Amino acid sequence: MGKLIVSLSPHAHGTDTVERNMYGVIIALMPALLVSFYFFGIGSAIVCATSVAACVLFEWAINKFMLRNERTTICDGSAVLTGLLLGFNLPSNLPIWIIIIGALFAIGVGKMTYGGLGNNLFNPALVGRAALLVAFPAQMTTWPKVGQLGSYLDAETGATPLAIMKQAIKSGDATILDQLPSSLDLFLGNHPDGAGAMGEICALALLLGLAYMLWKKIITWHIPVSIIGTVFVISGLMHLASPVYANPVAVILSGGLMLGAIFMATDYVTSPMTPKGQIIYGVCIGVLTIVIRNWGAYPEGMSFAILIMNAFTPLINNYVKPKRFGEEVKK
């Protein structure tokens, strides 16, 4: 009789890996990246390349010289993804040295301080963006106009749709909203006066990325739909209450809402684990986004809303737990 050889568990292996998910999200970002190249040209290429290179370099250096890890993590795609998302949250005319500082905060403070991928409390790219917004508010809120393919530091700047909405609320003058691009232009990324951050300009490109990630089962619908749906409903009620508030379609197509809801809030590490927890998380992000956009110091509130709810993710996970195997379901 032959020997029975039993290997260590687990005996069943799936194809879902860190590398697969990271590179899957990177692929999903390609439509938005190509659109940013089309609208911003060399500025977009410089910002994204600098951000990605700096994030990869800082992760390698911290692993090797500070944490002294023998195994590098730069090949798993997480540093590249952080660099891309950070670049997507920046103006296309931002000086290179400021981008490098943002990458240092994203990787050094937002990720490696907690022990690396899987341990971070906050989304690293948003940590980098928030740090730059506090340290360099003028540079981080000066947005170049679209269609300047050969421009970088000398690009013309203009008012973004969110800035127009904010001005209408502050002044109480609803006619200011007439300056907004049409909903179709917002959807396609045609913002003639001021576009905003590179990755948030075209909702169509971001929705293509969402469709790809849902198809590949990289993410589920719960977080993006709950965020966008919450913002749509609340902004719709506000628009009905007063004409100084923009229509809900313009609100969800403007700023970083789509980018944040699809690519930032859905980060595995910093978002809740259960569908119910994800919906609670998404609704809270939507409410906070509306509050900060309309009554906060900055026109955009998506980044801060996500960071705030990142801090509450452990609490949500603690109180919204899946049923344990064998546990009796209460009737």
Q: Which stretches of residues belong to each language-model region?
A:
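Long hydrophobic alpha-helical segments that form multi-pass transmembrane helix bundles
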Residues: 122-207
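N-terminal signal-anchor module of multipass membrane proteins
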Residues: 1-56, 329
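Structural signature of hydrophobic alpha-helical transmembrane segments
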Residues: 42-54, 93-102, 192-203, 245-257
